[in-house]
Amino acid sequence: MAPSKARSSPAVERRDRLTLAKLASYDDVATDALVDRAYFWTNTRKNRTKYIPVRGIMDDKVAEILLHHVIVAKDTVKAERELLAISGIKKYMAKLPSDREKEWFRRHLRKYIQMYLPDCPFEVTTTNRYTITEHEAAICARKFIKQGQEIKYLSGTLVPMTREEEQDLDLKRKDFSIVMSSRRKTPSFFLGPARFANHDCDANGRLVTRGSEGMQVVATRDIEIGEEITVSYGEDYFGIDNCECLCLTCERAVRNGWAPQVDSEASSTASTPALNDETKSAHGSTSPQKRKYAPDADSDASASPTPQKRRKFSRQYSKLRTEVSLSGDVTAIEPDPEQNTKIAVETTTDVPKDKPATNGVTENESNARVSENQRATSDREPSSPLGVDESQNSSASTAPTSLFDVGIKLEESTEAFTQETLTTTKAGSVADSHGDGDCRQLTAGIEQEALSELSESLELDDKSGTVVKRRKRRTRRQVVPSVEDESHRVRVPGDYTKTSKLLAQSYDRWVECRTCKTWFLQHNSYLTRRECPRCERHSMLYGFQWPKTDKDGPLDDEERVMDHRTVHRFLYPEEEARISRRDRGVSFGVTPTPELSEPRTETEDSEACDERRNTRASRRRTQSLRMTM
């Protein structure tokens, strides 16, 4: 029989397939080179926590390759070859072990190169709607997109995930690109340009699969120029029914995460169960989570609701160990020779006597013998240092671990107990020391482990072998950093734009873009910039004013600016004189979001100050809102 053809082992196939770690590494380098180093005003979120930017990648070099080979010549193959020749990317490619991995990296890099083609209908921008102090990546349309049209170049790569990889991403808060495959019913990790699309309850895009490893975005309705391209992450992704969602649709409707908080709810937060960790909103101060699939049924059954704020853990001791304080000063009490002190011992264990106890001895008899020994000792020593209080026997179900757990308060005394009685072999007995050295056994049957379970106010002195008061040790209180999320701050629609919370320095100011008419924060605004970072970056890359990327036709005589350094990026002195620096652009009481603001009319005379830039209706609305604050 001819031998069958040898198949490759599963280990080799597993080693050759595209894994999550490999795809995450490719995406980090690609976004670092083609997004962050292409005149981008911030750094995009990386998949690896300890990612170090690749050295040897210069912004001017990347922008030159994109301008000449991608934007003007529309030759992505040559642009890819030029980018791979950059020293930083070349060193990274040399570290890849196999040719197959190098091909995977080139294929993923090509997706980001195609974003800069003139016919690409979108571009990467940022928004601080979800986290006010940090800008998250977003996708903005720069061309009109029809309903049902597949958004060109807005794609990504899918890679299957294991359960261990999924849990690791949850711990690192990097689970913002997890999608659930409707066909295979397994989680997959999704990376590429389309991963920058944010969630919206009324999304204008939809994620669809293309092949086994591809993902594309299709427009579900008409998308206008300047509108953010969004997709839906799921019905219960940001809490139950997305109750913590901070999308633009919820902001306009003032619902979910934008809903006003009622005072009665604030007082009952301690008794109100909070959502599970997996359903917490990613739009808060922590890292955003995106496209996270709904948890399994078994995980929901095991999870229990936790309070909004976890109470500080405190160890609760049994009441049997608590001391019963005597009335008055214990040291001032003189023992009455006519009335002897009684000690009631509650125990459920057999107490051995001087002679070995038989099986017929009951628990009551053993307790009676112990009481007789204690009474005889008390009669012989009227001036015993023990000051005790009468106590009654409780039920047999309550078993203290020590004689000192029943309310005995001891004073410091070197005559209390001797070292000899503490070194018994199996059962330790507590003996009372007499003046002439005569020791009589007080109790027996308490094992040696019980000696370590003394009352909290007592301890064993190793030198003298006596039980003395425990000295209070001075402990330095250390502040333990909290691992819990802070309580969610109440969000108000438009609180992320024209707010004073982002004005960290004296010359920081909110400025209105002269191109797209949106407000942006300019740091150190000694001279006012003409355009926002998005429009300025577009002009530096394409040589045209946003959103234009190429000539409209043969009749278009506007020339492309090949050197962005020749463009004046600030306002001229006569324009600067008409700008009011009052309040540094901060808005009080008016929602400054462009989509929510009322339409306004502008004239040449209305540019004297910011207050005159609104219509009469807007001024009336401003006054009414200020009166209600």
Curated annotation (Swiss-Prot):
Keywords: Chromatin regulator, Chromosome, Methyltransferase, Nucleus, S-adenosyl-L-methionine, Transferase. Residues 264-274, 338-350, 359-376, 390-400 have a biased composition (Polar residues). Gene3D superfamilies: Histone-lysine N-methyltransferase, SET domain. Residues 264-400, 586-629 are annotated as: Disordered. It catalyses: L-lysyl(20)-[histone H4] + 3 S-adenosyl-L-methionine = N(6),N(6),N(6)-trimethyl-L-lysyl(20)-[histone H4] + 3 S-adenosyl-L-homocysteine + 3 H(+). Pfam families: SET. GO terms for molecular function: histone H4K20 trimethyltransferase activity. It is found in: Nucleus; Chromosome. Residues 120-234 form the SET domain. Disulfide bonds: none annotated. GO terms for cellular component: chromosome; nucleus. Its EC number is 2.1.1.372. GO terms for biological process: methylation. SMART domains: SET (SM00317). Belongs to the class V-like SAM-binding methyltransferase superfamily. Histone-lysine methyltransferase family. Suvar4-20 subfamily. Histone methyltransferase that trimethylates 'Lys-20' of histone H4 to form H4K20me3. PANTHER family: HISTONE-LYSINE N-METHYLTRANSFERASE KMT5B, SUPPRESSOR OF VARIEGATION 4-20-RELATED. This is Histone-lysine N-methyltransferase set9. It comes from Aspergillus terreus (strain NIH 2624 / FGSC A1156).
